[in-house]
Structures are given as structure tokens and as C-alpha cells.
Regions:
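Short beta-strand/loop segment that forms part of the nucleotide-sugar
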Residues: 8, 29-37, 58-62
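Short, well-formed alpha-helical segments that are part of the catalytic scaffolds
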Residues: 7-30
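A structural alpha-helix within SAM-dependent methyltransferase catalytic domains
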Residues: 21-25, 32, 47, 75, ...
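Residue-level preference for short helical/loop micro-motifs built around acidic side chains
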Residues: 15-18, 40, 44, 69
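Conserved donor nucleotide-binding strand/loop of the catalytic core
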Residues: 44-73, 77
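Catalytic-site signature of metal-activated, phosphate-bearing donor transferases
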Residues: 67-76, 82-88, 92-175
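A conserved acidic beta->alpha catalytic loop
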Residues: 23, 33-46, 63-64
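Cell-envelope/extracellular polymer assembly enzymes that use nucleotide-activated donors
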Residues: 3-5
Length: 175
């Protein structure tokens, strides 16, 4: 069976993070979340939620430097935990329809449609957990893929990322 690790960077997301977890709990096998300096109870919520669901994982701490640095730190921290990594943010909701994780084996990375009812676009949100993927760019970061990467598209009838945009640290995004 193909395994999937939830991977994120978070800071002060206690008001919304459980909503995301509830949306992914049925397809993830583990989690690796990088906290960049939460001062609320985000870390405690993460631990308690996944302990109650018997989902293994870890929280790593790395002070926020920039999105590229922290996302790469987070990805490196989950190396060896799963076959694939699911890259999400706390202010998203993963809508799962007709999705079989075992189909992931056919490709190295996957576009998932992301957005809202009026506008959506393809974004690489699942990658093979092999240490070959990294982010580039300080603020408007993008995923750098290996030259021999085979990318698949997950149809909107299988998965869709609803980008709600109400993250807890939007107001102090660069602190």
C-alpha cells in the first residue's frame, strides 16, 4: 500500500488547523509538521489530534527565515517516513471524492487543482518522498523538480484543494 505523509509549515494556526486535519485524516499515514514559532496552542493541538487518531508523526521546530528555507526544512524532516508527501497549508481544505492512493505509484509528483468555486489552477501538492524535491524563491516559492520527474494530474473528481485563505498568521506573515 502506498503511504502518504502530511507536510506543512505552521505558525499560530490554532483557530483553523483542525479543519484541515479533519479533511485529510482518511488518506494520510503520518505527519511531519514544522512549527516556525507558534505562541498559541497550535503545537499542542497537532500532538493531541494525531495521538487521538493513532497517526504517527513528528513536529519539528525551525524559526521562520523565509518560505523557501522553512518548506525545505520541513520536507527534509520527513524523509523516509512515507512513499509520498502531501504539501498543504493550514488554511486549506482537502476535498476527497474518488481517490485511491495506490495510483500515486505511477508518477513522481502530482498536480492537484487548487482554488475556489470561481477560480482554480494546477499546483504540485504531492511529491515522491525521495529527497529530490525542494522549493526555490523566498516569498513566491515554487517547487523545483528533478529533470526526469514524471508528473501526473489528479482530477477534480478525485481531490480538490479548497483554498480558504484565512490562515492565523496572515497579518504577520513575514515576522
Amino acid at each position: 500500500m502506498t503511504t502518504l505523509c502530511l507536510n506543512m509549515i505552521v505558525k499560530n494556526e490554532s483557530k483553523i488547523i483542525l479543519r484541515l486535519f479533519d479533511s485529510v485524516v482518511n488518506i494520510i499515514d503520518c505527519y511531519c509538521i514544522c512549527d516556525t514559532g507558534s505562541t498559541d496552542n497550535t503545537v499542542e493541538l497537532i500532538k493531541t489530534y494525531f495521538e487521538n487518531k493513532n497517526i504517527p508523526g513528528k513536529i519539528v521546530n525551525e524559526p521562520f527565515k523565509n518560505f523557501c528555507h522553512n518548506r525545505n526544512f520541513s520536507i527534509r524532516s520527513c524523509l523516509g517516513m512515507s512513499d509520498y508527501i502531501l504539501l498543504l497549508d493550514a488554511d486549506m481544505l482537502l476535498q476527497i471524492y474518488n481517490f485511491d492512493k495506490n495510483t500515486l505509484r505511477n508518477f513522481d509528483s502530482f498536480y492537484i487543482l487548487q482554488g475556489n468555486d470561481n477560480f482554480y489552477y494546477q499546483n504540485t501538492r504531492i511529491v515522491r518522498n525521495n529527497g529530490l524535491y525542494s522549493y526555490v524563491g523566498v516569498t513566491h516559492e515554487y517547487l523545483n523538480t528533478p529533470s526526469n520527474n514524471k508528473t501526473g494530474l489528479i482530477n477534480k473528481t478525485e481531490l480538490f484543494i479548497l483554498d480558504i485563505g484565512d490562515g492565523g498568521s496572515k497579518q504577520n506573515k513575514f515576522e
